[in-house]
Amino acid sequence: MEKYIMSLDQGTTSSRCIIFNKKGEIVSVAQKEFTQIYPKAGWVEHDPLEIWGKQAGVAGEALNIARISPEQIAGIGITNQRETTVVWNKRTGMPVYNAIVWQCRRTAGYCDELREKGIDKTIKEKTGLMLDAYFSATKIKWILDNVEGARELAEKGDLLFGNIDTWLIWNMTKGKIHVTDYTNASRTMLFNIHELKWDEELLEILDIPKSMLPEVKPSSCVYGETDEILFGVSIPISGDAGDQQAALFGQTCFNAGMAKNTYGTGCFLLMNTGEKAVDSKNGLLTTIAVGIDGKVEYALEGSIFIGGAVIQWLRDELRMVKTAQETEKYATEVEDNNGVYLVPAFVGIGAPYWDSYARGTILGLTRGAKKEHIIRAALESMAYQTHDVLKAMEEDSGIELKALKVDGGACQNNFLMQFQSDILGVEVDRPEVVETTALGAAYLAGLAVGYWKDRNEISQNWAISRSFAPAMEDEKREKLIKGWHKAVTKAMDWEDKE
C-alpha cells in the first residue's frame, strides 16, 4: 500500500490541504476560503470555529480527490499563519473571542506604552523580535483585559492560548494535546529563543498566566495522533512549523546564507543563519528557523505586511482588475512606471522601517498616469520592499546573497519575478513545486515518521522551474530604488498617534 504525507496549510485567507508523495510531488489539493472580519479600522479577526471546520473539511476533500484512504497517510504536517492568537476555554473547547490576526493593529498603543518603559530592549534580547502589535503577546493580553470573565478563567487555569497550529492540533486530538513547535513559539514575543523556554519575566510584564501556554516541542516529532472521529483511523501528527519557516524548509534552505521569499498576503523573507542567532542592527527579526535533529537553527526575517494583498486591493476595492493574473498583462502594456510609486502601508510598514503609523500612498501621479501605471507600481512595490529587507540581511549577516528562492502565489507573475531580479541584481529561482509552505510541513512530518530518511534525500527533490536573471543597468536600478525610498519617507508617520 503506497503511503503519502498530508499537509494542512492554514493561511490568512484560506485553509488548504495538500497531499504529497515520496518525490515531494503534489497528489491532490483542496482549499476553502474563510471570512475576514474587520470590526474597526486596523482591526482584523477570524472565527476559530470556522477555521477548524474548513480545515477538517478540506482534509477529507483532499483524500477524496486523491482517491486514497486515511490508512495511506503516514503522517500529518501542519503549517499556519503565525502570531494569530486564539484563546479558548479548555472545558468547553469554545473560543472566548475571535482569533486576533497577525495583521491586527489594535494593540499598537499598548506597544508604545511598553516602549516608553524601555521594555522593547528586553523583548529584543530575549525573543529576537521587535516590540510590535504584530506578535501574539499583546493580543493575548488584550483578550484577557477586554473580554468579560477572561482574566478570571485564566487565573483559574481554565483558558488555553494557542496560535493556529496549537488550536488545530488540540481539535484534531479532541483536546488531548496542547502543544506548539519552536518556530511558532518564537513568534509569540513570550519565548526566550536562546534558552528555548517561555520567559517568566515577559509573562510577568504582560500579566499572562503561564498555565495558558502550550508545551513547546521540535518542529519534527510525533505530537500525538488524530482522534478516530476525524478520519476513522488514528494518524500521527508529526510536523509543525509557522508558514514562513515551513517554506524555508520546503525550499531546502538548509545551509547558512540560503534565503527565500514567499509572496503571499504578506511577503516574508527568511535567511538561514545556522546555529547562530544573528542580532539585527537593521530592524530585522531574529527567529527560530526549525527545531530538528536535537537542535534549533536560526534565521533572520524581514516581514512585509502587504504583499499580494495589494493585488487583492486592486481587484476588490479599486476594481482595476478582475483577477490577480491580469496584473501581469496590464503591467507589461506600459514601458515603465511613469514615475508612479505605490507604498502599500495599509496597516503600517514592516522591516526594516517598522512604522505602525505609516499609511498607503500613491506618489508621482501626473495627468499621464494610467491604470496600468498604478497596477505596475503595485507589483513593483513587492520587489522594492523585498530589496530593502534583503540589503538589511546582507549587512547583518555579512553574507552576500547569490540567488533568491521564491514561492507563494505571486511568484507565478513573470513580470514581478523579472523585475525582482532586476532590482536585486541577483538570480531569482522559482521551483517546480511552488507550494513550498505545505511541502516544508510535509517534509517535517515525513522525517519524524521515517517516510524520508534525512535532509539529503529531501534536497534531491528540489528542482528549478524557471530562473530569472537580472537584465537592468545599474544606473536605472539605482534611480528606481532612490525614487522608492523617497516615496516610503512620504508615507511614514501619517496616522496621528493617539
UniProtKB/Swiss-Prot annotation:
Residues that hold sn-glycerol 3-phosphate according to the record: 12, 82-83, 134, 243
Q: Which pathway, per its entry?
A: Polyol metabolism; glycerol degradation via glycerol kinase pathway; sn-glycerol 3-phosphate from glycerol: step 1/1
UniProt keyword Cell membrane, yes or no: no
User: What Gene Ontology molecular-function terms does this entry list?
Assistant: ATP binding; glycerol kinase activity
TM regions (residue ranges)? none
Assembly state and interactors?
Homotetramer and homodimer (in equilibrium).
Q: What name does this protein carry?
A: Glycerol kinase
